[in-house]
Design a protein with these regions (language model features):
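Catalytic phosphate/metal-binding cores of nucleic-acid and nucleotide-processing enzymes, i.e., regions
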Residues: 1-78
Length: 78
């Protein structure tokens, strides 16, 4: 699911919570950020601890607690 956000570093967040992603359905999700259709590879707070740490063209955040995502969306949803 891709959700529009108002954030200085990103304009959308992808949230995946199926069994085929790095998550625990119902408790945590895998997320990624995008700006103008491109991956945001720089860690975004408050999710930096979940950033995959890879250097490259993509960046995902694994096993992010859904409560943390919900709080972020409460403040940043477009």
């Amino acid at each position: 699911m891709l959700i529009k956000i108002n954030h200085p570093k990103a304009d959308s967040i992808s949230i995946q919570d199926s069994e085929f992603h790095w998550c625990r359905p119902g408790f945590s999700s895998e997320i990624a950020f995008f700006k103008r259709g491109s991956w945001v590879t720089e860690p975004i707070e408050p999710f930096a601890d979940y950033h995959d740490g890879s250097v490259g063209d993509t960046a995902v955040y694994s096993y992010v607690p859904n409560t943390l995502i919900d709080a972020f969306l409460d403040e940043n949803r477009a």
